């Protein structure tokens, strides 16, 4: 009679088996009576898992805020859309709030200024840039960067004032068209070799 005992590395898992040899069969195959016992694995349920969607939390916060305003009177705080991040690195990342807005605002001002100066003096975009335009570009860019970042650092997002004709979507699309228009104006004047509008 042979007996064997094995223990695994996982706690609470062990096996004990007993094997009784009864005979050898043809071709020397082992035939025997085997019995193995495995204890029940018990779960250690000392913790609970809770999963919630963020939407539910936001809805609950809005409901609580509405209940407070109904109970205590009108809400006098300004309507602010919360900005989740205020790190400058995150704001200037590829999908951040700042890059497209700053570039769009610069392009809108730049396009209007380039066409206005061209109509007034007859100089093309390149002569405007090389004759004092770089200083104006740097000054305007600094003002636009500050004008874009200060409200974001104060907790306002561009979508906070989305009512009426002036909204953030219109600003984004106007900025995109101005970027395309400014590049097209410079390219056309480069190919033509002079100002687009001759005065």
UniProtKB/Swiss-Prot annotation:
Residues 53-82 are annotated as: Disordered. One of its GO terms (cellular component) is chloroplast thylakoid membrane. The chain crosses the membrane at residues 130-152, 172-191. It is a multi-pass membrane protein. Keywords: Chloroplast, Membrane, Plastid, Thylakoid, Transit peptide, Transmembrane, Transmembrane helix. It is found in: Plastid, Chloroplast thylakoid membrane. Residues 1-52 form a transit peptide. Induction: By light, ABA and desiccation. The keyword Transmembrane applies. Preferentially localized in the chloroplast-rich palisade parenchyma cells, in extracts of desiccated leaves, in seeds, but not in roots or untreated leaves. Residues 53-62 have a biased composition (Basic and acidic residues). Possibly exerts a protective role during water loss. Belongs to the ELIP/psbS family. This is Desiccation stress protein DSP-22, chloroplastic. It comes from Craterostigma plantagineum (Blue gem). The gene is DSP-22.
